[in-house]
Amino acid sequence: MYYSVERRKFAQLFLNKMKKFIVIALIAGAFFSSCGEFNKILKYADYEYKYEAAKSYFGNGQYAKAASLLEEVVTILKGTGNGEESLYMLAMAYYNQKDYITASHYFSNYYNTYPRGIYTELARYHSGKALFLETPEPRLDQSSTYKAIQELQMFMEYFPNSDRKTEAQLMIFSLQDKLVMKDYLSAKLYYNLGTYIGNASTTADGKINGNNYLACITTAQNALKDYPYTTMREEISILLLRAKYKLGTESVEEKKEERMREAIDEYYAFKNEFPESKYTKEVESIYKNASKYVKELND
């Protein structure tokens, strides 16, 4: 009886393993069969057949294979009835693989080749979105961010009534926030460097000012001017006030009063725009110290 039970357990275990082996074998067979079929298609000279195969692969979500075939036929199909579709599909194949730079290149190629094509609106939109998805973090070079903004703005100009206009505008706002963050980080770096001479700003005659606060002020002011509706406006404004005050404290005597007065003016501007700021205690302290210095100077 004991051996009978053990035999049944062994038989069941063996059957389970065999089932798994069969499933794996079937999957592997299908995979190699699919690879073999694709390699055969690559060797075909019939570009129409390759195009139909590419459409089939694309429809099944096999974008890498679709792209490989479309790369071979897209130039041949240019000027034919399938020219537009093949080029747009190639761009989408790369887009769906998250190869956004290549995708944007082909979307751009499409709308320049077919400015009134049936996919032109989608091509312009996806070209901008592809560049948007590829933009780097704020600390890095933002050249691609400017390019993405330009592409999305062009989309909105060409298709002002598009259903995708709102999404395009939101992407532009997001990209602008990234540029603001870049400026903010630069301004903050200048502020933190302070009087470090190795990276100090200079006067018109080439003399070292002995601080980086002027560079911080200029960078912060430009950010507020270029992006007046940024969500980081308060953070940039407090940095600007701090820099003006520190510039005043570090200035030579003949410039100190003027710069302290500029810090006081900045205080009023900050209080007017952010009356309930979380930095209220700090800005009041800056105002008190700057005012005290100016008062003592004129007593």
Residue locations for each model-derived region?
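Acidic, polar-rich low-complexity tracts and alpha-helical solenoid repeat scaffolds
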Residues: 2-5, 31-299
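Sec-dependent bacterial lipoprotein signal peptides
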Residues: 2-35
